[in-house]
C-alpha cells in the first residue's frame, strides 16, 4: 500500500485524530498530505518494545530528515502535532473539533483544481524527489512546457490574464 500511494493519480490525505504510532506514523508520512488534530501525537515507538521501526523509517526519514527521524526511531518518544507540523510530518494542524471539516475543505480545494494537472503534477513531483537537482529541474521544465499546452492551462491563464471567472476544468 505504501508504494502505491505515490502512483495514485489522486492526492492521498491522512486525517489524524489522536495517536499514530509505528505503521500508523508510517502511513501518515507516506500520504501526500496530512491533516492532524491539535491533540494528535506521533511516534515510531517499536524500539521501546525491542524492535526498530524499519519500514516506518523510510517515509518518516524522507519527510522529516535524518536527524529528526533517527531521534524518533532511536527513542520511540512521541511528538505532538505542532512538532509534527514544524518537522514536516504533517501539512496542517487544526483544532480537534474542526478536523473533519478542515480535512474535507482541503480535499474540496484540491478537487476544484484541474484534475489532469493534479494527477500529472503529483506524478512529476514524486518522480523528481528521487532525482538529482539538475535532473529534477530538467524534468520540471519539460513538465511545465507540456502542461502549458493543455486546454485547462490555456483556459486558466486566459481567465487570469483577462480577469475572467475561473473556467470549468475539462481534465484536458
Residues covered by each model-derived region:
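Crotonase-fold acyl-CoA enzyme core
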Residues: 3-118, 150, 155
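C-terminal alpha-helix plus adjacent terminal tail
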Residues: 76-82, 101, 105-172
Amino acid at each position: 500500500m505504501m508504494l502505491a500511494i505515490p502512483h495514485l493519480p489522486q492526492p492521498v490525505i491522512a486525517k489524524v485524530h489522536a495517536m499514530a504510532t509505528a505503521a500508523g506514523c508510517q502511513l501518515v508520512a507516506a500520504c501526500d498530505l496530512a491533516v492532524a488534530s491539535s491533540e494528535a501525537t506521533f511516534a515510531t515507538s517499536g524500539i521501546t518494545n525491542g524492535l526498530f521501526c524499519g519500514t516506518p523509517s523510510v517515509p518518516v526519514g524522507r519527510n522529516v530528515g535524518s536527524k529528526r527521524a533517527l531521534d524518533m526511531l532511536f527513542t520511540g518518544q512521541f511528538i505532538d502535532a505542532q512538532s509534527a507540523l514544524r518537522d514536516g510530518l504533517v501539512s496542517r494542524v487544526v483544532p480537534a473539533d474542526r478536523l473533519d471539516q478542515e480535512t474535507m475543505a482541503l480535499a474540496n480545494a484540491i478537487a476544484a483544481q484541474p484534475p489532469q494537472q493534479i494527477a500529472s503534477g503529483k506524478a512529476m513531483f514524486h518522480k523528481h524527489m528521487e532525482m538529482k537537482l539538475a535532473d529534477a529541474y530538467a524534468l520540471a521544465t519539460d513538465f511545465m512546457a507540456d502542461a502549458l499546452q493543455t486546454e485547462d492551462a490555456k483556459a486558466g491563464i486566459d481567465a487570469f490574464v483577462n480577469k475572467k471567472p475561473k473556467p470549468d476544468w475539462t481534465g484536458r
